[in-house]
Amino acid sequence: MAERGGAGGGPGGAGGGSGQRGSGVAQSPQQPPPQQQQQQPPQQPTPPKLAQATSSSSSTSAAAASSSSSSTSTSMAVAVASGSAPPGGPGPGRTPAPVQMNLYATWEVDRSSSSCVPRLFSLTLKKLVMLKEMDKDLNSVVIAVKLQGSKRILRSNEIVLPASGLVETELQLTFSLQYPHFLKRDANKLQIMLQRRKRYKNRTILGYKTLAVGLINMAEVMQHPNEGALVLGLHSNVKDVSVPVAEIKIYSLSSQPIDHEGIKSKLSDRSPDIDNYSEEEEESFSSEQEGSDDPLHGQDLFYEDEDLRKVKKTRRKLTSTSAITRQPNIKQKFVALLKRFKVSDEVGFGLEHVSREQIREVEEDLDELYDSLEMYNPSDSGPEMEETESILSTPKPKLKPFFEGMSQSSSQTEIGSLNSKGSLGKDTTSPMELAALEKIKSTWIKNQDDSLTETDTLEITDQDMFGDASTSLVVPEKVKTPMKSSKTDLQGSASPSKVEGVHTPRQKRSTPLKERQLSKPLSERTNSSDSERSPDLGHSTQIPRKVVYDQLNQILVSDAALPENVILVNTTDWQGQYVAELLQDQRKPVVCTCSTVEVQAVLSALLTRIQRYCNCNSSMPRPVKVAAVGGQSYLSSILRFFVKSLANKTSDWLGYMRFLIIPLGSHPVAKYLGSVDSKYSSSFLDSGWRDLFSRSEPPVSEQLDVAGRVMQYVNGAATTHQLPVAEAMLTCRHKFPDEDSYQKFIPFIGVVKVGLVEDSPSTAGDGDDSPVVSLTVPSTSPPSSSGLSRDATATPPSSPSMSSALAIVGSPNSPYGDVIGLQVDYWLGHPGERRREGDKRDASSKNTLKSVFRSVQVSRLPHSGEAQLSGTMAMTVVTKEKNKKVPTIFLSKKPREKEVDSKSQVIEGISRLICSAKQQQTMLRVSIDGVEWSDIKFFQLAAQWPTHVKHFPVGLFSGSKAT
C-alpha cells in the first residue's frame, strides 16, 4: 500500500505529520485535565505527541514509530492527525477552542472482486452534543469510524468533556478514508461511534465500550455529496432509533473515486522501509475487545487492522538485499543437485542402478538446501515452499491422453495400472519423473512378445471398454490396446517398487509431512468404495487381456440392440474354469475374468452400450441379466463397481441391470436366496452342487448338468429381489508410521466378520465365506509384519455410519490364540426390537459390549425365509469367559482354573455399530463379503448406503417366495 500523509492546521497553530508503512502517526493538542483547567494559568503550547494505530482483530502491536509511543501496530493503513493546542484552558467567559484533528486511513480493498472498488471518503465533524447522560463519571470520549461488517476501526484522540453534564463540544475533526465500496450489495454503511475507555474498579483497562452509534449510508453519499450542515443522531440502542442520546453536526460529507494512476506510481516506488522490515517488530499483546491499546496512552490515535497477516505476506515476498548477499552460493548448490538428477540418454534410465543410499543422499542434500534457503531468506511465507509439484517449472495446461489419470476419481481406484502402487498420477508427477516413467513403459512394452499394436482391429473401442472418465481404466500411456500376457509377465515386467523409487524422494522433500498423504496413491488414502490394490482379485498392475475384448466383441454386437444376458465367470480357480468351459462349449455369452480390472472393464463396457442404446431409442431398455459365477468375494467386486458407477447416474439406471448369483463354494447371499426361492435352492444349494465344487480338483467326467442348471436360471429368472446395500467404513493404519490413518468406504450386502477368517470352520453358521481367492496380501493396508504404531489421532467417533458382517481375528498378544479384546458400541434402529437374551436396553442410547471375543459377526441379510426387507442388522457375538479360580481342598497344589466357557449372543435391530480393539496398538482383520482387509484400527457399520443406490437387484425364479 502506498504511503499516505497529511497535515492540518487550526486557528491556534499548525501541525503536520506523515505516516509510513507499518505505523500510524498523529499529532494532536495536549489538553490539560478538567480539574486543572480552573487552577493553572495559561500554558505554552505543548509539543505534538505521537499517537498509535492498533489492530482490532488481533490486537497486535508492532514496532515503535516514535519516542513517546510505547508501541505501534503494523497495518495496511496510514493514519495522520494534526492540530494545535489551544492557547489555554477555558477561563471565565471564554469559549473553549474546538478540538482539532485530521485523521487519515487507507483500508485494504478486495481487488479480486469486480464489484468492489476503492473510494475516498471525507467527513468533517463540527460539534458533539450530549443529549443524555450515558455513563457515570464520563469525562472523556472517543469518536470512532468503522465500516459495518468490518473489524477495522479508526479512532480519534480522547476528547475531554467538562464536568457539567450535558454539554456541547466544538469539534474540527476531519476523517479521510480510502475504503472498499461494494457496488452489488448493501454493505456500505459507515458507523460513527461514541466510545469510552473500559474501566475496572476505577482503573482504566484495555478496550473500549461503545456508548452510542450512528449510521451513514455510503451509497447515498456517493450519489448526493453534501457540503451543508447535517445532524447525525447517535443511539445507544440500535432497535430504538427514535430517541437519540447524542448528536454530531456534520459540515461536509463526500465519497470520491480514487486516482488509479497516482496510486500505481506510488505502488511502483518501493520505499526503503520495506527492506528494513524486520520480524523483531512483531511484539503482540491481547485485549478483551476491539481497539485495544496500552492503557498508559489513552489520548493516542488508534487504528485497527484485521488483515495483518496479509500485509506481512505481501511485504515478505520482497527479499532483502542485505539478506541475499549472505546466502552462501545457493545457486551453485542448486545446479549441482540438478546435475545429479540428469538422465543420460546413452545409458537409459535404469532405476535398478539407483540404490537406496543414493536416494537418501539426495534427500539429505535437498533438505539441507531448503534449510539454508529458509535460514538466509527473511521470507516466512510458508505456502510458497509447500508445493506438491516438482521444483521444475509447472507444465502448461494441455489435454491429457485418454488413459492417463483416470483413477484420480475418488471412487474409481480399484482399477490397476503401472501407476497404482507407490506411484503418482499425472496430476502429481513432475516433468522429470514423467520422462523416467516414459522410458520405463517403453522398455516394458518392448519386452512383451505378444503385445498388440494400434493397428490391431478390435470392435470394442476404448470408450466402449472403459466408458467415461469416472469409470475408466488407468493403463500406461503408450498401451492403447490390451496385451496378451500371463500373470508372470505382469508380475515381472515393471516392478512397482521400481516405479515407486522415482517418486519417493520427490514426495519427501517437496511436501510437508501432513500433506504427503495427498500425493500418495489413491489406494492408500481414498475414501472410495474401492481400492487400487483390491484384496479379492488379481494384481494391481494388470490390464484387461485380449481374450476379454474378443469375448465382449461376440456379445456386444451393435448399438441398436442390447444382449439379453452376460455371464461373468471368475476363472482364477478350477471351479470357474470348469463352468466357463462347459458354457463355452454350448456357445453361451461368457466372459472369463481373472481380476477386478477385467470385471470392471466388462461392466463399464456394458454401461456404455446401455447409454448408447438410450441415446438412440426412445423406449426404455429391458434389464440386462448379468450372471456372476464365483464366490462371495467375486460378487463383492461387482457390487462395489455397481454402487460406485450408478452413484452419478439417475435412479432409472437402477433397473437397467439384474444380477444373477451362481455360487461356487460357500456363499451366504446364495444361502439366503435359496431360503426365499425353492427352485433356486434346488439348483445351486443341493448336496450334488455343493459336493462338486467343494473338491480340490475338477471331476474326470461330468456328473452334473452344470451348464443346464446355469442356463435354466439365466432364462427363468423373471423376478427381481432387492437386497439392501449397507456401508462399512474402515479406518486403516498407514504404511508409514508417521503418516495419518485413512478411511475406506465399502458397500456390502452379506456378512462382515472380525476374528477367525481362516479356512477353519466358523463358529456361526456353516462356515460362510472363506474367500475364494487367496487374501494373504490385502489391498487396503500394509503387511501385518510392519511395526505396530499407535495413532492417537484416529479414535472411534461418537457415532458410526455403516453396517455389515464382522469376524474377529486371533491376536498373538492375546491370552488365547483365537480371541481378541474388543469394544463394540451399537445403536438399535427400532425401540420394539430387543435382544434375544431378553435384556432391557434403551434403543435411543448407545449400548456397549466390552469383552474378550472369539468371534463377532454382523449380517445385513434378512432372516432366512423372509422376503420382506428390514432396515437393520443382526449381530452374533461369541465371547470367551474365564471362570474364577476354584481352590482345591486338602491339597497343596495351586488353585486350578476351570475351562474357558463360550457364550453366544444374538442382537437384532442394529442400525449403527462401531468396533475397535481395547488396545489402540492392536490392529484388526475384517472380512467383508468374503474380502479380507488388514491393519484396521477400527471400523463403523451402517445399515444403509448413503447414496440413492440403496439396493442391489438380484434375479430369482418366479417362485412363491420371491418378491
UniProtKB/Swiss-Prot annotation:
The keyword Magnesium does not apply. InterPro entries: Phosphofurin_acidic_CS-1. SUPFAM superfamilies: beta-sandwich domain of Sec23/24. Residues 1-22 have a biased composition (Gly residues). Residues 53-72, 770-804 have a biased composition (Low complexity). GO terms for molecular function: transmembrane transporter binding. Residues 1-72, 78-97, 262-299, 377-428, 476-542, 760-804 are annotated as: Disordered. Its main location: Golgi. Keywords: Acetylation, Coiled coil, Disease variant, Golgi apparatus, Host-virus interaction, Intellectual disability, Phosphoprotein. Residues 276-293 have a biased composition (Acidic residues). Residues 406-428, 483-496 have a biased composition (Polar residues). Residues 353-377 form a coiled coil. The modification N-acetylalanine is found at residue 2. It comes from the Eukaryota. It is linked to Schuurs-Hoeijmakers syndrome: An autosomal dominant intellectual developmental disorder characterized by intellectual disability in combination with distinct craniofacial features and genital abnormalities. Associates with AP-1 and AP-3 but not with AP-2 complexes. Interacts with FURIN. Forms a ternary complex with FURIN and AP-1. Interacts with NPHP1; the interaction is dependent of NPHP1 phosphorylation by CK2. Interacts with PKD2 (via acidic region). Interacts with SORL1. Interacts with WDR37. Belongs to the PACS family. This is Phosphofurin acidic cluster sorting protein 1. It comes from Homo sapiens (Human).
